[in-house]
């Protein structure tokens, strides 16, 4: 068996850059199979504002991937038993891949990692396109093309099932293949902490940055930094994580959440709402009632409770270190290890 990784384009400041380096090695070690990466080449580093990719460039990238896949079929390189892993399941080329395999009589398997789509009202597709028939039918068709549909959280599976049909036999809740993160931030652990609170998310409506900005005005004794406003390198970003006591979220969209995990790895307290994927992933010590930040109006009503919670975290920081360690261990095992993913691919 050859495992073909149909990858998502890499953005230097996103985990997609690390997947380029680590995923092929991890997959090969776990399966002992030949691993081939199908890349679309270089891609614009300037993402569409508020998004994690470039809406034009991503289609150029996917088209180049499809050309390579088609050429390999024409040259007879794709064989029975081969496995195609799409690291972003929202990739229409999977339909053409299934088309070629079926018509040419090549018995392959296909898996895809779902990140978001129109079925999430807070995603770009959900906000701008919504439940337009073309996008819902496209997503259902892509889902059906995959033998294995991988989701990182039960919340994401439930969200998907609210708008689209789910087949439990081809739907898997697995950790994302990010075990490389566990030790990659070791050099930033143990840094001197300062009264720093970070907003590590994209600047997008569903991240509710206005709440963070308002908190800055009401808690002048602490330093508040919006990371994406700083044009940070990965090293500079991780330095801030290492110095921060708290990572704050009021997100309205989250199907996994990597930044709060990275923060916890270097002993930054995650303060997250009890909603979305956070509900199943976060320990009770780090969750606050969802109503506090369900929207800006509710935030204003509960501002006193939010600020009181932040002050407790900041002033009693060391009391939470044991719980942070428990949180990290849980996330390492259940959400940021690809072992179950590799097992599904290996059959």
Q: What is the predicted role of each segment?
A:
Residues 144-186:
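Donor nucleotide-sugar binding/catalytic pocket of nucleotide-sugar-dependent glycosyltransferases
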Residues 83-90, 102-124, 131:
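Active-site proximal beta-strand in glycosyltransferases
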Residues 293-347:
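A charged, aromatic-enriched C-terminal amphipathic alpha-helix characteristic of glycosyltransferases
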Residues 128-149:
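Membrane-proximal helix-turn-helix segments that form the acceptor-binding/catalytic region
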Residues 251-252:
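Aromatic "clamp/platform" in nucleotide-sugar-dependent glycosyltransferases that forms part
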Residues 1-96:
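N-terminal pre-catalytic "stem/leader" segment of glycosyltransferase-like enzymes
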Residues 178-207, 213-217:
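Conserved donor-binding/catalytic core segment of Leloir-type glycosyltransferases
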Residues 269-272, 279:
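Short hydrophobic beta-strand element within catalytic cores of glycosyltransferases
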């Amino acid at each position: 068996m050859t495992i073909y990784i149909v990858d998502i384009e890499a953005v230097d400041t996103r985990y997609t850059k690390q997947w380029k380096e680590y995923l092929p090695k991890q997959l090969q070690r776990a399966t002992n199979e030949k691993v081939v990466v199908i890349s679309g080449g270089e891609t614009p580093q300037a993402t569409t504002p508020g998004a994690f990719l470039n809406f034009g460039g991503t289609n150029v990238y996917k088209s180049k991937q499809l050309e390579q896949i088609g050429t390999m079929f024409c040259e007879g390189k794709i064989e029975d038993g081969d496995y195609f892993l799409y690291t972003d399941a929202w990739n229409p080329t999977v339909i053409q891949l299934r088309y070629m395999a079926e018509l040419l009589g090549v018995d392959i398997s296909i898996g895809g990692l779902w990140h978001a789509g129109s079925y999430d009202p807070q995603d770009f597709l959900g906000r701008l396109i919504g439940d337009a028939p073309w996008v819902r039918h496209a997503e259902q068709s892509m889902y059906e093309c995959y033998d294995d549909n991988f989701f990182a959280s039960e919340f994401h599976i439930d969200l998907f099932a609210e708008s689209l049909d789910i087949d439990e036999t081809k739907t898997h809740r697995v950790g994302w293949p990010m075990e490389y993160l566990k030790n990659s931030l070791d050099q930033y652990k143990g840094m001197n902490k300062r009264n720093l609170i970070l907003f590590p998310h994209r600047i997008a409506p569903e991240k509710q940055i206005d709440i963070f900005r308002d908190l800055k005005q009401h808690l002048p004794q602490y330093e508040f930094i919006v990371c994406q406003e700083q044009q940070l390198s990965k090293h500079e970003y991780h330095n801030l994580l290492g110095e921060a006591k708290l990572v704050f979220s009021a997100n309205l969209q989250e199907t996994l959440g990597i930044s709060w995990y990275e923060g916890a790895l270097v002993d930054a307290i995650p303060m997250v709402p009890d909603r979305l994927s956070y509900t199943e992933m976060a320990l009770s010590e780090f969750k606050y009632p969802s109503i506090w930040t369900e929207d800006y109006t509710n935030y204003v009503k509960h501002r006193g409770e939010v600020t009181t919670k932040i002050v407790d975290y900041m002033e009693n920081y060391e009391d939470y270190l044991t719980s942070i360690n428990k949180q990290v261990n849980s996330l390492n095992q259940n959400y940021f290890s690809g072992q179950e993913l590799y097992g599904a691919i290996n059959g």
